[in-house]
Amino acid sequence: MGKFKMRSKDLRGMSVEELEKTLRELRIKLMGLRYKAKVGLLENPGELREARRNVARILTVLREKREGEKA
């Protein structure tokens, strides 16, 4: 995962398995960023914010896909 905004449009094109894999990777990255922020090593605080928002985007798309399967 690079330092970029994930687009919801791109995420909607991914399968549930791909989204879950990406979510796991992002959560691990987010954990590392939080650690760096805590010890003062985080160079770009915006990266932490962007990672949190990317996690939220993925969770939103996953919820939409799962609700779509039920309907």
Curated annotation (Swiss-Prot):
Keyword Transport: no
Database matches in PROSITE patterns: RIBOSOMAL_L29
Domain of life: Archaea
Single biological process term from Gene Ontology: translation
GO cellular component: cytosolic large ribosomal subunit
One Gene Ontology molecular-function label: structural constituent of ribosome
Keywords annotated in UniProt: Ribonucleoprotein, Ribosomal protein
PANTHER family reported for this sequence: 60S RIBOSOMAL PROTEIN L35/50S RIBOSOMAL PROTEIN L29 (PTHR10916), LARGE RIBOSOMAL SUBUNIT PROTEIN UL29C (PTHR10916:SF0)
Entry similarity comment: Belongs to the universal ribosomal protein uL29 family.
Protein name: Large ribosomal subunit protein uL29
The encoding gene: rpl29
